[in-house]
Swiss-Prot record:
InterPro entries: Bifunctional_GlmU, GlmU-like, GlmU_C_LbH, Hexapep, MobA-like_NTP_Trfase, Nucleotide-diphossugar_trans, Trimer_LpxA-like_sf. GO terms for cellular component: carboxysome; cytoplasm; membrane. SUPFAM superfamilies: Nucleotide-diphospho-sugar transferases, Trimeric LpxA-like enzymes. The gene is glmU. Its EC number is 2.7.7.23, 2.3.1.157. Residues 1-226 are annotated as: Pyrophosphorylase. Residues 227-247 are annotated as: Linker. Gene3D superfamilies: Hexapeptide repeat proteins (2.160.10.10), Spore Coat Polysaccharide Biosynthesis Protein SpsA, Chain A (3.90.550.10). Homotrimer. The lineage of its organism: Bacteria, Bacillati, Cyanobacteriota, Cyanophyceae, Synechococcales. Acetyl-CoA binds at A376, N382, Y383, A419, R436. This is Bifunctional protein GlmU. Keywords: Acyltransferase, Cell shape, Cell wall biogenesis/degradation, Cytoplasm, Magnesium, Metal-binding, Multifunctional enzyme, Nucleotidyltransferase, Peptidoglycan synthesis, Repeat, Transferase.
Length: 456
C-alpha cells in the first residue's frame, strides 16, 4: 500500500515568470503532470499535491484529475514543513508514502518501482533515491555505510569542505513508512542557515534508512530556471527519439526534430529535418513528414506526405500529398489520395477522396465531394461578419481559377465553374456556371502621355 505526496508549493523565482514553476510545460505536459504520470504504474492509493504559491492555478490545472487531492502549505518553510501538512489528512494511514518533487519531471516509472520494492523488501523506515553526480554542486550529500545504510544527509549550503568532496547526492525522492515518519515529523527544527525545516533531518530520528542509486543520474534533475527547463527538454527528446529509432522509425537529422511522447508513429515512417510532432498525433505506416512541418493533435494516414506544412486538429487520409506551404486546421478532414498544394488553407472542411486543391486557395466550412478539382485562387467566402456559413461542392466538379463561392451556397455534381466567377446562388448538377462581367475591348486605345517634368 503506497500513497504519493508531490511537493508543488514553491514559486520558482529563478524562472522569472508569473506562472508557478510546476505549471511550466515540458513536451506537452506541465512539470507536475509529468511527475504524476511517473507514479501511475504504482497504482497509489492516494495522490496528494502540496500546493502554496498560486495554489488555485495549480489546482485548476488538474481539475480533471479526480484522483488527486490538494493540501495547502500557506508558508513555504521547507520540505519538512511541507510534509508536516499531511499529518491531519493521513492520521489513520498505515502504509508507505512516496515523496516526489513537482519540478523533477524526468523520473522513470521503473526507477520508482525499484525504490518502492527495495523499501518494502527491507522493511525500511525510509529509503532515499541517490545519484553519483559529476558535479554535485547544489545537491545535499548522502553519507552511507557499506550496506547503503544512511548515516547522515547534509544540505549543500551546510556542507564543509570535506563533505563537499562526496559526490553521492540526495535526489529529493523518498519512500517512507508513514507511521514512523509521522512520529518523527514533530521533532524537526529550523536550526540551519535557511531557518527551514528540512525533511532530510528525519534521518536522525529513524532507524533503517537506506539509499538506492538511480541508474541514470539525469532522472533526478530538478528545474529551477529556463536553462534547466531547456536541458530537460533535450533529455526528454533524446529518450523519445532513441525509442522510436529503435522501433524502426527513420529520423533524418534527429537533433532538428521534436516529438511529444504522446505521438504514435507506425512502421516505416520517415521524419525529415525541422519537423515537430505534438499532442495526440498519429502518423500512419510508410508516411513521410517534412522537412519543415508541424503536425499537432492530428491523424495522418498511411503512405502520405507532408512537406513544409502545418496541420492541426485535423485528419489526413491515406496517400494524401500536402504542401509545400499548406495549412490544414480546425477539424478538417482530407480524405484519401487528395492533393493539398502550395499556399492552400483548409479550415473545418471535408475534402472528398481524390480531390485536388493545388494552389493559392482558401476552403473554410466547406464540404467537397470526390474528384473535385479546385482551380488556383479559389476562395470560399464563409463569413458574413457575424456567422460562418457552409459551401457544398458536389463530386466531379471543377472550379476555374480565381473563383469565389459566397456562402451559404450549394454546387451540384459534375459542375464546371468558369474562371473568375463569383458564385452566390446554388448551381444545379451537370451545368456550367459563369458569373463575371463580359469582357469589353476598346479598339485603338492609347495610354495618355505622362506629363512632362515641371507640369502639374
Amino acid at each position: 500500500m503506497v500513497a504519493v505526496a508531490v511537493l508543488a508549493a514553491g514559486k520558482g523565482t529563478r524562472m522569472k515568470s508569473d506562472l508557478p514553476k510546476v505549471l511550466h510545460q515540458l513536451g506537452g505536459y506541465s512539470l507536475v503532470e509529468r511527475v504524476l504520470q511517473s507514479c501511475r504504474p504504482l497504482a497509489p492509493e492516494r495522490q496528494i499535491l502540496i500546493v502554496g504559491y498560486q495554489a488555485a492555478a495549480v489546482e485548476s490545472s488538474l481539475a480533471g484529475r479526480s484522483d488527486v487531492e490538494f493540501v495547502e502549505q500557506r508558508e513555504q518553510l521547507g520540505t519538512g514543513h511541507a510534509i508536516q501538512q499531511l499529518l491531519p489528512c493521513l492520521q489513520d494511514y498505515q502504509g508507505d508514502l512516496l515523496v516526489l518533487n513537482g519540478d523533477a519531471p524526468l523520473l522513470r516509472s521503473e526507477t520508482l518501482e525499484n525504490l518502492l520494492a527495495t523499501h518494502q523488501r527491507h522493511g525500511n523506515a525510509a529509503t532515499l533515491l541517490t545519484a553519483h553526480l559529476p558535479d554535485p554542486k547544489g545537491y545535499g550529500r548522502v553519507f552511507c555505510n557499506g550496506d547503503n545504510r544512511v548515516t547522515q544527509i547534509v544540505e549543500d549550503r551546510d556542507c564543509n569542505a570535506a563533505q563537499r568532496q562526496n559526490h553521492r547526492v540526495n535526489g529529493g525522492i523518498y519512500c517512507f513508512h508513514w507511521p514512523r515518519l509521522a512520529a518523527a515529523l514533530p521533532k524537526l527544527s529550523a536550526n540551519n542557515d535557511q531557518k527551514e525545516y528540512y525533511l532530510t533531518e528525519v534521518v536522525d530520528y529513524l532507524d533503517q534508512v537506506m539509499a538506492v542509486d538511480v541508474d541514470d543520474y539525469l532522472e533526478i534533475n530538478g528545474i529551477n530556471d529556463r536553462k534547466q527547463l531547456a536541458a530537460a527538454n533535450d533529455i526528454l527528446q533524446n529518450r523519445i527519439k532513441d525509442d522510436w529509432m529503435a522501433q524502426g522509425i527513420t529520423l533524418i537529422n534527429p537533433d532538428s526534430i521534436t516529438i511529444d511522447d504522446t505521438v504514435v508513429l507506425e512502421a516505416d515512417v520517415i521524419i525529415e529535418p525541422n519537423t515537430h510532432l505534438r499532442g495526440k498525433t498519429v502518423i500512419g505506416r510508410g508516411s513521410r513528414i517534412g522537412p519543415g512541418s508541424l503536425i499537432e493533435d492530428s491523424i495522418v494516414g498511411s503512405d502520405a506526405s507532408v512537406l513544409f506544412s502545418v496541420v492541426s486538429q485535423s485528419q489526413i487520409g491515406d496517400g494524401c500529398r500536402l504542401g509545400p506551404y499548406s495549412h490544414v486546421r480546425g477539424e478538417a478532414d482530407i480524405q484519401a489520395n487528395c492533393r493539398i498544394g502550395n499556399f492552400v488553407e483548409v479550415k473545418k472542411s471535408v475534402i472528398g477522396a481524390q480531390s485536388n486543391v493545388a494552389h493559392l486557395s482558401y476552403l473554410g466550412d466547406a464540404m467537397l465531394g470526390q474528384r473535385v478539382n479546385v482551380g488556383a485562387g479559389t476562395i470560399t467566402a464563409n463569413y458574413d461578419g457575424v456567422s460562418k456559413h457552409a459551401t457544398v461542392i458536389g463530386s466531379g466538379t471543377k472550379t476555374g481559377a480565381n473563383s469565389v463561392f459566397v456562402a451559404p451556397v450549394q454546387v451540384g455534381e459534375g459542375v464546371t465553374v468558369a474562371a473568375g466567377s463569383v458564385i452566390n446562388r446554388d448551381v444545379p448538377a451537370g451545368s456550367l456556371a459563369i458569373a463575371r462581367p463580359r469582357q469589353r475591348i476598346i479598339d485603338n486605345w492609347q495610354v495618355p502621355p505622362a506629363p512632362q517634368s515641371g507640369q502639374p
